[in-house]
């Protein structure tokens, strides 16, 4: 019986693909070597310990229907579209070795006519007249008895969109995370015109089989043809939840300030695991009571635009004379945290 397993995803859903990856990694026999090939439609994928409000322009993502997905490995934020080919290599220890999986990807690129090399811990680069250009980035995860290496190959990605979603608004945001580094990148199609996702997948599969000296049939998976994995539904529910994608953010503080015709407002939020733990409100309004009441109501709430909007509008019954001001405040506040 082969120790290899090959999975190809027909789904562009990042939550589905990451849930498949997580399930297989947790449940695979320690003797198995797995290759999983996939790609995501418009998605910002963040590292396990990152703060989406710091790393991403969450407002623009919502406007453009770009999903947020938190992966289980560390590292920085990346933008995925269908111009990215994603790969995951998994193996039990002591066989797991990220230099092996890196060598497989380099061999695949070489078979297509692209000479690349590893650079630093995470990247693959090609040398051009204008300097080294990054064509692949990776992240890793290890447990006591297994590990995985996953990454992307830039095939024909819309590189102009990287800045759209990975450059946050210039908010007064103080966070305990580390800002991702945006390096110089290149698409493989610039080096090999006409190359496709299928070409890359076939090359990686062949390099995978060649390295291990055996072949297996591919398992093609999708939401309509899910792999036989215990607890997959629960894993998918977690992967697609707000609590995982946003709520796992490191603790941070956020300052909002604005001047309205009825007075200036300054709000200080302390946020942990996606929930507001402390709110301070300052205003020169002649009637500060609604803002003081709002500050008290928000403690314990999820740091979500719709939740802040609901809490603010709920005060109208207590302060009917300030209804117009509260509606103006709620619209501004919700827009500021998106």
Swiss-Prot record:
Its main location: cytoplasm. ATP binds at residues 71, 76-79, 134. It is found in: Cytoplasm. It holds the Pfam family Lip_prot_lig_C. PROSITE patterns: BPL_LPL_CATALYTIC. The keyword Nucleotide-binding applies. Keywords: ATP-binding, Cytoplasm, Ligase, Nucleotide-binding. Residues 29-216 form the BPL/LPL catalytic domain. GO terms for biological process: protein modification process. It catalyses: L-lysyl-[lipoyl-carrier protein] + (R)-lipoate + ATP = N(6)-[(R)-lipoyl]-L-lysyl-[lipoyl-carrier protein] + AMP + diphosphate + H(+). InterPro entries: aa-tRNA-synth_II/BPL/LPL, BPL_LPL_catalytic, Lipoate_ligase_A, Lipoate_protein_ligase_C, LipoylTrfase_LipoateP_Ligase. The keyword DNA-binding does not apply. Pathway: Protein modification; protein lipoylation via exogenous pathway; protein N(6)-(lipoyl)lysine from lipoate: step 1/2; Protein modification; protein lipoylation via exogenous pathway; protein N(6)-(lipoyl)lysine from lipoate: step 2/2. Its EC number is 6.3.1.20. CDD domains: LplA. (R)-lipoate binds at residue 134. One of its GO terms (molecular function) is ATP binding. Monomer. Belongs to the LplA family. Catalyzes both the ATP-dependent activation of exogenously supplied lipoate to lipoyl-AMP and the transfer of the activated lipoyl onto the lipoyl domains of lipoate-dependent enzymes. In the transfer reaction, the free carboxyl group of lipoic acid is attached via an amide linkage to the epsilon-amino group of a specific lysine residue of lipoyl domains of lipoate-dependent enzymes. HAMAP family: LplA. This is Lipoate-protein ligase A. The gene is lplA.
């Amino acid at each position: 019986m082969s120790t290899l397993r090959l999975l190809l995803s027909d789904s562009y859903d990042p939550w589905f693909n990451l849930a498949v990856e997580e399930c297989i990694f947790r449940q695979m026999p320690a003797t198995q070597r797995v290759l999983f090939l996939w790609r995501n439609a418009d998605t910002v994928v963040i590292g396990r310990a990152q703060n989406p409000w710091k790393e991403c322009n969450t407002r623009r993502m919502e406007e453009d229907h770009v999903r947020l997905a938190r992966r289980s490995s560390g590292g920085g934020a990346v933008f995925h579209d269908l111009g990215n080919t994603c790969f995951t290599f998994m193996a039990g220890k002591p066989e797991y070795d990220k230099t092996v999986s890196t060598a497989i990807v380099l061999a695949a690129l070489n078979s297509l006519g692209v000479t690349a090399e590893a650079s630093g811990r995470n990247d693959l680069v090609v040398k051009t007249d204008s300097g080294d250009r990054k064509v692949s980035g990776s992240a890793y995860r290890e447990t006591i008895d297994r590990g995985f290496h996953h990454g992307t190959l830039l095939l024909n990605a819309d590189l102009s969109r990287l800045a759209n979603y990975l450059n946050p608004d210039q908010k007064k945001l103080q966070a305990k995370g580390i800002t991702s580094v945006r390096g110089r990148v290149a698409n493989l199609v610039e080096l090999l015109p006409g190359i496709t996702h299928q070409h890359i997948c076939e090359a990686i599969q062949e390099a995978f089989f060649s390295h291990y000296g055996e072949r297996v049939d591919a398992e093609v998976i999708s939401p309509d043809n899910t792999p036989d994995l215990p607890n997959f539904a629960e894993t998918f529910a977690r992967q697609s939840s707000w609590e995982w994608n946003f709520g796992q953010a490191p603790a941070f503080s956020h300052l909002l300030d604005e001047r309205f015709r009825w007075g200036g407002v300054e709000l200080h939020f302390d946020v942990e695991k996606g929930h507001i733990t402390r709110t301070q409100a300052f205003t020169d309004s002649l009637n500060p009571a609604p803002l003081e009441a709002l500050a008290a109501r928000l403690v314990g709430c999820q740091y979500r635009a719709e939740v802040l909007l609901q809490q603010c509008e709920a005060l109208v019954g207590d302060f009917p004379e300030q209804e117009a001001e509260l509606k103006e405040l709620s619209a501004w506040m919700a827009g500021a945290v998106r």
